[in-house]
């Protein structure tokens, strides 16, 4: 109140009532915030994909087309060193390296599943190509890397190369390899399974100098314009991943291919072992029981998967021996005590890992949710030899109905 002359002014302040947000309004607000964050994440991810696409086939980049594969491979080593990824690759990743023509992805998937079943922490898997989303190439503990982690690693790799190192981005697959090393390093990967992209000797994944174990899956004629037009030449390129004093395993090969692998083994100075084959009834190739009373029912269909699963078993055993993994070694020793005469020891953890293996797009059956009469049979192949087992798998399922 204030007096002015003969008038008295009275000021009345009306305080607003405290605003009360209804619980439903709070939920709606939080949902809107989440939707906004998700939309932003999707937009950021799409931007990454657009930038990544520029590295395909030298698109929008001034890269000389006459740079040899050897020179590109040497340069990639420089990227690994300059990005400070060498220590992780050689010391922390405990890599399993797999080359071959047929069954590389399936073999790697079997390895991943068996390792996870044996409680190995932070198992990384680098494969190619992807089926739907590029993040499928970077699996951590059986799942594709998250979009947020992908985005962070992508921009770190790209900006470090361009802005700090003042170097050009490598082409698509090589860039993805560097990106993968960053992703797996940040995830604290303790075992990194590397699937060769093409060939072996000059493949980006062959930047690893000290893997724990290497392998060559079934060989055939593929990429003859790059690798050579005979099985001997192709086998020689695939065997380029062999390392001195690192045990190498191979699936059974035709004599011509085996001769090249043996020759490379002598040149490098390593041991080469043909993987012993397990039968789906739980026996090895000599009829000895491999552990457990139940049959080994592989998670991937097709009789040819026995070859890939057998190779994966050998790789995991050798990996455990080289890394001194107590859990796996204990399982193997326990099984040996139960079956001292068995030549091929297959603990229950290995059997369960083989059974749980999943690899989208490989002998996969998808039934339409909206139609009971529509079923999709999915498989992939890039050579005539690879198409044959896929066709046999499809025929077996259809004829069984």
Per-range role (PLM):
Residues 191-194, 203-215, 219-220, 233, ...:
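Nucleotide phosphate-binding/pyrophosphate-handling subdomain across enzymes
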Residues 129, 179-226, 258-297:
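Extended acidic/charged loop-beta regions that coordinate divalent cations
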Residues 213-217, 245-250:
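Conserved beta-strand/loop subsegment of P-loop NTPase cores
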Residues 235-243:
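Membrane-proximal helix-turn-helix segments that form the acceptor-binding/catalytic region
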Residues 123, 248, 271-273:
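Hydrophobic beta-strand scaffold residues
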Residues 1, 6-14, 334:
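Intrinsically disordered, low-complexity terminal segments enriched in Ser/Thr
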Residues 15-102, 106-119, 247-249, 256:
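N-terminal leader/targeting and accessory segments in enzymes
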Residues 41, 62-73, 77-95, 117-209, ...:
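ATP-dependent carboxylate-amine ligase catalytic core
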């Amino acid at each position: 109140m204030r007096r002015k002359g003969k008038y008295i002014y009275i000021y009345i302040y009306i305080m607003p009532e405290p605003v009360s947000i209804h619980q439903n309004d709070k939920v709606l607000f939080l949902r809107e915030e989440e939707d906004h964050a998700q939309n932003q994440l999707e937009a950021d991810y799409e931007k990454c994909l657009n930038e990544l696409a520029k590295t395909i086939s030298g698109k929008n980049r001034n890269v000389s087309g006459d740079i040899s594969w050897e020179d590109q491979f040497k340069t990639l080593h420089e990227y690994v060193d300059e990005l400070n990824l060498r220590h992780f690759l050689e010391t922390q990743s405990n890599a399993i390296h797999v080359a071959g023509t047929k069954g590389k992805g399936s073999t790697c998937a079997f390895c991943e599943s068996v390792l996870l079943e044996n409680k190995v922490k932070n198992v990384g898997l680098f494969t190619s190509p992807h089926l739907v989303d590029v993040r499928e190439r970077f699996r951590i503990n059986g799942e594709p890397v998250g979009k947020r982690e992908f985005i962070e690693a992508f921009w770190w790799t790209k900006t470090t190369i361009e802005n700090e190192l003042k170097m050009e981005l490598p082409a698509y697959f090589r860039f993805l390899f560097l990106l993968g090393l960053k992703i797996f390093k940040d995830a604290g990967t303790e075992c990194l399974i590397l699937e060769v992209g093409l060939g072996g000797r000059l493949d980006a994944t062959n930047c690893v100098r000290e893997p724990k174990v290497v392998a060559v899956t079934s060989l055939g004629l593929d990429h003859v314009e790059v690798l050579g037009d005979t099985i001997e030449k192709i086998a020689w390129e695939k065997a380029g991943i062999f390392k001195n004093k690192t045990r190498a395993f191979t699936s059974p090969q035709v004599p011509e291919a085996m001769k090249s692998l043996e020759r490379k083994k002598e040149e490098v100075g390593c041991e080469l072992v043909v993987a012993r084959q397990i039968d789906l009834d739980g026996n090895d190739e000599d009829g000895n029981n491999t552990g457990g009373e139940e049959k080994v029912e592989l998670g991937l269909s097709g009789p040819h998967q026995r070859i890939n699963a057998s190779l994966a078993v050998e790789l995991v055993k050798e990996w455990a021996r080289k890394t001194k993994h107590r859990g796996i070694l204990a399982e193997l020793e326990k099984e040996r005590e139960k079956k001292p005469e068995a030549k091929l020891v297959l603990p229950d953890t290995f059997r369960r890992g083989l059974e749980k293996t999943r690899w989208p797009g490989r002998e996969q059956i998808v039934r339409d949710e909206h139609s009971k009469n529509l079923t999709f049979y999915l498989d992939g192949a890039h050579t005539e030899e690879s198409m044959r087992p896929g066709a046999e798998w499809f025929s077996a399922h259809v004829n069984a109905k």
